[in-house]
Amino acid sequence: MADPWQECMDYAVILARQAGEMIREALKNEMDVMIKSSPADLVTVTDQKVEKMLMSSIKEKYPCHSFIGEESVAAGEKTVFTESPTWFIDPIDGTTNFVHRFPFVAVSIGFLVNKEMEFGIVYSCVEDKMYTGRKGKGAFCNGQKLQVSQQEDITKSLLVTELGSSRKPETLRIVLSNMEKLCSIPIHGIRSVGTAAVNMCLVATGGADAYYEMGIHCWDMAGAGIIVTEAGGVLMDVTGGPFDLMSRRIIAANSITLAKRIAKEIEIIPLQRDDES
């Protein structure tokens, strides 16, 4: 039986490359930077242009599908997540990196049907790395098959996370306290590249053993989530329960063992869900 969503995935890869070219061109020029929810939550005209290109191109080809995009939600659209085929679009994951020309900037496209991940595309466009994952068919980077690491001993692990965009003192206290608790176990280290999607893809490559974060959004996770699971990894809530795309929090790890060990250390940050906004 033919794969009903392969054509969608192939089209998404083409569009991600086009978006990446737009971003690389924009990096050569001066940019207008605007502030969203906090002084560390930035948006540029390029974010909006790239999302408009992606949304309009996909809507023209698949008018019956649903769409959730970062900049559309920022402009006031509701996050309505149903069983219908739904595209999750983050035009520039790592906008602060983009603004500073720090070379980790990604286009993220996730596609879900019946609320299950079917495929994900993460194009780290400065690096020219195209990460893809298709349900039941594996995860790849530039055509090379990905496999998570086998390191389940947290004392020998390398984790990735972010400080996040909130600058509220209590939120920062929890974020830094969680990092301190994990480092004190001890572990080999914690790294940050400034984009949730690329952080998750690094788990899929085996370069990092796990990633955790609270305060991100569904469009940050929808593309990379299936890349992690198709590389042999797991997605889990930071409480140790099942992963919930709308919860704004995640552990993406090489194994249930490591994910649960991380969850044991984490203090939870109270967050409004994406589907409550």
From Swiss-Prot:
Q: What Enzyme Commission number(s) apply to this enzyme?
A: 3.1.3.25, 3.1.3.94
What does its activity-regulation comment describe?
Answer: Inhibited by Li(+), Ca(2+) and Mn(2+), but also by Mg(2+) at concentrations above 3 mM.
Top-level taxon of origin: Eukaryota
The top EC class is hydrolase
Q: What induces it?
A: By lithium Li(+) in hippocamp.
Checking Pfam families in the record gives:
Inositol_P (PF00459)
Q: Which residues form the signal peptide?
A: none
Gene Ontology annotations for the cellular component aspect, listed alphabetically: cytoplasm
User: Could you tell me which SUPFAM superfamilies the record lists for this protein?
Assistant: Carbohydrate phosphatase
Task: Write out the function statement from the record.
Answer: Phosphatase involved in the dephosphorylation of myo-inositol monophosphate to generate myo-inositol. Is also able to dephosphorylate scyllo-inositol-phosphate, myo-inositol 1,4-diphosphate, scyllo-inositol-1,3-diphosphate and scyllo-inositol-1,4-diphosphate. Also dephosphorylates in vitro other sugar-phosphates including D-galactose-1-phosphate, glucose-1-phosphate, glucose-6-phosphate, fructose-1-phosphate, beta-glycerophosphate and 2'-AMP.
Per UniProt, which keywords does this protein have?
Answer: Cytoplasm, Hydrolase, Lithium, Magnesium, Metal-binding
Q: Where is this protein localized, as stated in its record?
A: Cytoplasm
- Which pathway does the record list? Polyol metabolism; myo-inositol biosynthesis; myo-inositol from D-glucose 6-phosphate: step 2/2
- Subunit and interaction comment: Homodimer.
Q: Chaperone as a keyword?
A: no
Q: Which organism is it from?
A: Mus musculus
State what protein this is by name: Inositol monophosphatase 1
Q: Which InterPro entries match?
A: IMPase, Inositol_monoP_metal-BS, Inositol_monoPase_Li-sen, Inositol_monophosphatase-like, Inositol_monophosphatase_CS
State any single GO MF term: lithium ion binding
GO biological process terms, alphabetically, are: inositol biosynthetic process; inositol metabolic process; phosphatidylinositol phosphate biosynthetic process
